[in-house]
Amino acid sequence: MEVRTSFSKARRIPEAVSTLINEEFVVVHQQTEDSSGKDAKPQLKVFSNGDDQLEKAMEEILRDSEKDQNNSTALPEGSSDACSQASGLGSGGQTNQPSLQLVLDPSTTEVSARRSSSPSEPLEEDSVLFNKLTYLGSMKVSAPRNEPEALRAMANMKSSSQAPLSVTLYVPNVPEGSVRIIDQSSNVEIASFPIYKVLFCVRGQNGTSESDCFAFTESSCGTEEFQIHVFSCEIKEAVSRILYSFSTAFKRSSKQASDHVKDFVLHTPDSDVYTFSVSLEVKEDDGKGNFSPVPKDRDKLYFKLKQGIEKKVVITVQQLSNKELAIERCFGMLLSPGRNVKNSDMHLLDMESMGKSSDGKAYVITGIWNPNAPMFLVLNEETPKDKRVYMTVAVDMVVTEVVEPVRFLLETVVRVYPANERFWYFSRKTFTETFYMKLKQSEGKSHTSAGDPIYEVASLQRESAREEQLLSPTSGGGPVSSQEDEAEEESDNELSSGTGDVSKDCPEKILYSWGELLGRWHNNLVVRPNGLSTLVKRGVPEALRAEVWQLLAGCHDNEAMLDKYRILITMDSAQENVITRDIHRTFPAHDYFKDTEGDGQESLYKICKAYSVYDEDIGYCQGQSFLAAVLLLHMPEEQAFCVFVKIMYDYGLRDLYRNNFEDLHCKFFQLEKLMQEQLPDLYSHFSDLNLEAHMYASQWFLTLFTAKFPLCMVFHIIDLLLCEGMNIIFHVALALLKTSKEDLLQADFEGALKFFRVQLPKRYRAEENARRLMEQACNIKVPTKKLKKYEREYQTMRESQLQQEDPMDRYKFICL
């Protein structure tokens, strides 16, 4: 695979495009016979965690490459903002090294990057070039973003291709660039089309003959006719790198598209959309009677704050488009640590000033921020190394023509340093966000005293959210799903529970299969129909989960439990305070559970309270609220309670809480024995670190993975649990450990725990990644006989331990 690039800037592979989300880039040095240690070239080794390290490493490579003239190998991810050199990946090099290497050599790159001067040759744009590809052809498709249809087309093209062509694929680095397919033998262009016409990318599934293939669809003739182009790679591992280049191009293209959207809004005089630019600045007391703007990191643009120093927050609001709206005043400025903050958690700042700017074009609000106040403790403690925290600031603006105050809310990243810290290198660039406000005529009061119409806010959207919509396949804007910003990708912030949207779209063929199966099932509710397990393993369609989950749990005839629930919610519970505390921390990232005393929290409270009264032995235990919340997202609270009780009793979840968690510890023992058998190297590494299963898997078992993982993954796990039983937890746990093995083998004790807590859940925000994980989990063998054997071993071990303990403890164990 030869790869050449005229320029590119390394970025993380988006989750929705590439499956190699565990890749991370670190620099390693390799000694050669001709070079000393100090002249050795850095190389690029692929793993997973940080653009900063990558860019610094790449800059070092570019500097060193000017001194060294050896032949080189290359990876598509080059990095240099101003560099016009290119890199080539040859077939040479040591075949026994698993790591990918990148060495840029001027003697070869200048030739490969040089633009063609021959009129007979196509002009090379700023592109990444991929050789050793075979073009299997193209065909028309009716659903350009349908993965099953794309995979079928890929399989058909792979099996029926009679005369595949060796081609070079050009993927542009610029938003106005074009994807080009060139015949290698004749250098003739086979096809060319702008990058924005590419709608969807897909790779062949592992374990199939198409595992070395990839394909993309493009709109060839307007919006009603689409083509899919299919390729195979001589080097299978190159598929992910090709998709990486596409994802980078999509990012740039979508950015340009969002600019076009903004231009359209700006130039539509009759539009009901009003555009605002809102900027944020934080100032600190400089000790000389003045307040100076705090510095921002040059690369990531996070604010650098100092501990204990009085601050001022300055927000500037400027209208950019449409008829000018009259801002009367700022109703309030609010601030809080964190992001996705509930309204009740925002704190009002004292206002120092508000009014129009000196040029009259903007409205400026200044608030006084005392960082020593208890509610701002998180923003006044020194931030640990390599970690940042979020801060949310909002202003409520009173606009003459709008009925209610308009809230502009900004979320940014900060780091807190000691009060005596000095900053040498920083950026003065302003933190700015663009908002699009859509108004509609008010049905109440129709005009102001001046005769202007009165409006209501129909929607208020940030530009960053618009860009995510442009990238979302469900919105028709592009080939990759919504991405968290780079700061979130690299931060140490844990993923909020309840994160992620789950699409209700489902191919007609799958819905037909489920419809036929449900028809048979309703004819005989006592017996599960044939083919059920196969369909469930692929995931129950979101639109059908309420019905299917109740059928799987056996809640089709549960009038007695429904009546009992209505009585239980009227009874008092001794655990009401604990329940109230927990529901505020359950799925804060989900709109349904965000608001204090909202419908979501109210229903969740009633289910947890009812169960605490119903189950007198166990009552309510911390973590149960997450499972109840998952059920509430699919069905009314009465039905959710019935399914919840079934899972606790019939599926045995409540057993994990009994007898001082004895059964839970047995599960940990079984998991470690399975690791010892299936992942011996990881088991040995954990043993060396004294890292035990209870340290990372407690939440997996007690909450059924519902507490920290994205909803697309959580819902699929509940599908499998209700169909296959509690043992599915072992399947999912082993799949997580297998897919993360390389990262965990390199981690120390603290690093491994942090990986389980922070990085691991973030990997499955994309539905495709979660689907692949569930597919792997279903393929893992966990024999019931083996689990029974491990359970007996655990009982024997516990009996031996108790022989050494107090006789009363031993008696209690025997009575379990």
From Swiss-Prot:
Positions of the Rab-GAP TBC domain: 539-725
Keywords noted in UniProt: Endocytosis, Endosome, Golgi apparatus, GTPase activation, Protein transport, Transport
Biased composition (Acidic residues): 483-493
Subcellular location: Early endosome; Golgi apparatus
Residues the UniProt record annotates as site (Arginine finger): 581
Biased composition (Basic and acidic residues): 31-42, 53-69
Cited Pfam families: DUF3694, RabGAP-TBC
InterPro entries xref list: Kinesin-like, PH-like_dom_sf, PTB/PI_dom, Rab-GAP-TBC_dom, Rab-GAP_TBC_sf, Rab_GAP_TBC_domain
Gene Ontology biological-process entries: endocytosis; protein transport; regulation of protein localization
Domain PID: 125-281
SMART domains in the cross-refs: PTB (SM00462), TBC (SM00164)
Function: GTP-hydrolysis activating protein (GAP) for small GTPase RAB22A, converting active RAB22A-GTP to the inactive form RAB22A-GDP. Plays a role in endocytosis and intracellular protein transport. Recruited by ANK2 to phosphatidylinositol 3-phosphate (PI3P)-positive early endosomes, where it inactivates RAB22A, and promotes polarized trafficking to the leading edge of the migrating cells. Part of the ANK2/RABGAP1L complex which is required for the polarized recycling of fibronectin receptor ITGA5 ITGB1 to the plasma membrane that enables continuous directional cell migration.
UniProt name for this protein: Rab GTPase-activating protein 1-like
